[in-house]
Amino acid sequence: MTRRPWLIVAAVAAVPRLAVLLVERRDILTAFTEKSDDIAQVFLKTGTFGFVPGHPTAWTQPLYAWFLIPIYWIFDRSWWAVGVIQIAVAVGTALLVYELGRRLVSQRVGLVAACVATLNPYLIWHDVHENREILDQFLAVAIVLLTMILAGRRSLWLGAVLGVTLALAILGNTRLLFLPLICCAFLVGREQRTWAVAGVVLAGCALALVPWVVRNKVSVGCFTLTTDTRALWKANNPNTYATLAAGKWIDDVPPLPNEPPTPEFAGAYYKVYGKVLPVDECARMRFYRHLVFQFWRDHPGEKAKLAGQASWMLWDPQAIRTEGRAESGGAVDVLREWAQPAYSIALFVLGILGVWLLPGRLALFGVVLLAYQTLVAMGFAGATRYRVPWDFLIALAATAAVWWAIDRRRRRSVA
């Protein structure tokens, strides 16, 4: 195998992102940060994985914070370090898409699909800003590639690698909690060894998650992946539908009366006043989880409306635009209004046509994964950023459709 396709894919992924990085360099660490950035800074200054020194937190999905910590430690908190390293991750993602297509379809389909997937206008902008989906993309492709390899080669050590990869994906996005079961369902068969491989996958995933869960019990007070069930409540309460329908996001849902501070708010308060606000994360986790279950039980009709709304927001070809966002009214909005819909509509149409041209196991796995993302969105919330890490599956199908049409035309011209 020559290196030329790898170089092409790497260049296509890197060049536009480098251009965006240079244009956006002043905003990388100011206008578009998230709570993982705060946690990384506190950890490096005090050794506490939290928002307030000496007060550990589980109020987040921890993977992205752990990704930022070594970057800040080695290179300081600099826009170029975050941007360049995240571009490297995006390049790695594109190369994995190429490898997936090359192995399961053809080299040319893999090459074009990797280029199509990495040129998603939404990703080109977001990949250089601080957002945890940069890791979701890489891990998503790795999971699909490893699962497809294991489906044809029953390797226990590869099963362990897949298990750890799934655990990392869950630590980055708890919406993927049940993904290991889906992967194992595609691995098991009549042969006894397939069940052994599936067992290794589940064991590897569980063992990789245990340290974080135990840490939360010791440091925070409860066995959990994250205590932030308030995010689930924001997506499941009587005010959610109207808030989202008004063009806002779940963060704009009105808080409860006399609501106690969140760990994130406590961190911001500590920065300004130097005082520690008491926060019982485990009690809050149980409280908001109870409210969510109560809402589902008492308002099934409202929940059905929210599920439909979330599905549309997940699959809307036009990237979700919420009021009050930092980039409102600028060039990013122009991309959302014109470039993103043009890209997404073409991708979706060709993907539907091309799914029948992919190898059966890959096509079925891809459809199931996208259906899983839709079901999770119906339970939580839907947004473009939750879907795009998996758009490479659609890009593979779309490219297969294009090449099928090209080959058919060539055969007709020869005949």
Features from the language model and the residues they span:
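Transmembrane-helix signature of polytopic, membrane-embedded enzymes
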Residues: 3-9, 97-119, 137-138, 152-158, ...
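Membrane-embedded glycan-lipid processing machinery
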Residues: 21, 56, 60, 71, ...
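Membrane-interface transmembrane helices that cradle and orient dolichyl/undecaprenyl
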Residues: 107, 143-159, 169, 187-192
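Membrane-proximal stem/loop segments at transmembrane-domain junctions that anchor or position
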Residues: 224-314
